[in-house]
Amino acid sequence: MAIRVLTTRGELPGSGLRRLAGAAGLVSWHGTGRPAPEDLAALAPGSTAVLALGNDPVDAALLDAAGPSLRVVALASMGFDNVDRAAAAERGVVVTHTPGVLAETTADLTFALILAARRRLGAAAASLARGDWGLFRMDDYLGLDVHGATLGLVGYGQIGRAVARRAQGFGMRVLHHDPYAAETDALSTPVDLETLLAEADIVSLHVPLTAETRHLVSHRELAAMKPTATLVSTSRGGVVDEEALLTAIRAGTLHSAGLDVFEREPMGAELSPLAAEPYVVTLPHIGSATERTRAAMVDLAVDNILDVLRDRPARTPLPGTASAYERPVSGSRS
């Protein structure tokens, strides 16, 4: 049987697609923006594998459109909320993602957002671009210090720990809350979420988007934070209730925010109201966006596909889906 791989983008960084093309026939979506589920489903029949970006929809309809030949869905992302994991498990389809390779790069961007939000860099740069710098004033664009501040990390996996390491250079006190983190280290002190929210000057979110974490930060959590605090998120947009955050920012009950992710992505011309707030720094989901890291993500996704198609265990299966890798991948699904 011919090996056919559907990629949700026709062009990806690095040489991963060229490697994949040497082992399989490729069919790709070449539109603009985010592909609609029906666009991908139309290309899916007969696919052996799907290589998808982190916010491209991989639903039951796509899996069914691919048919019984489908063995693996490989995400070129760490997040996996775009995949119907239950549907994949029911159909015996392996699902993989790309943890590890993007942790340090995303931690860099997290710290960039911390600095930009606390020091009001976005508003200051916009003022300069408008030609407003006509007079030096001691009270222009006063921000808040990062050095010596208390940093609270919600989620203490690879990215959270990488952020904690960077915080040491700023002399920060670091707290973290993660009920699933078994390991402890000298970088951070584990606390409950209530303590973290009450004591942190900066709260940074590093959790996947699941039913449990959707709107993890909403009105109650924002009210528990200091009015001088900053909220930063490089995880997934749905973890933060954007309406609640906008209310807190406009009311002045929260100092600032730095966001790389949003509930609706991509936005196009219809921006989130948060993008216009002078105390909010917004970016278009670029946490892993360096040449080397994005290429490494594609390479790992391709490696996962090739491993499964060669009847080997995938390198980075999704958490909680190990049983999918124990089944023989040759033959069709029942």
Q: What are these language model-derived features?
A:
Residues Y156-G157:
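Glycine-rich Rossmann-fold phosphate-binding loop(s) that bind the pyrophosphate
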Residues A2, H147-T150, H219, T228:
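Phosphate-coordination loops involved in phosphoryl transfer and adenosine-cofactor binding
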Residues A66-R71, R91-V93, M172, P227-A229, ...:
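A short helix->loop->beta-strand "cap" motif at the edges of active sites that frequently abuts
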Residues A24, V93, S188, Y279-V281:
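Short, conserved active-site loop motifs that form the nucleotide-linked donor/cofactor pocket
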Residues M1-T96, A198, S218:
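An N-terminal-biased, well-structured beta-alpha scaffold segment characteristic
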Residues V58-A61, L175, P179-P273:
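Rossmann-like adenosine-cofactor binding region
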Residues P99-T150, A162-R165, A314-P317:
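Phosphate-binding beta-alpha-beta segment of Rossmann-like dinucleotide-binding domains, i.e.
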Residues V95, T228-S334:
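Rossmann-like dinucleotide-binding domain for NAD(H)/NADP(H)
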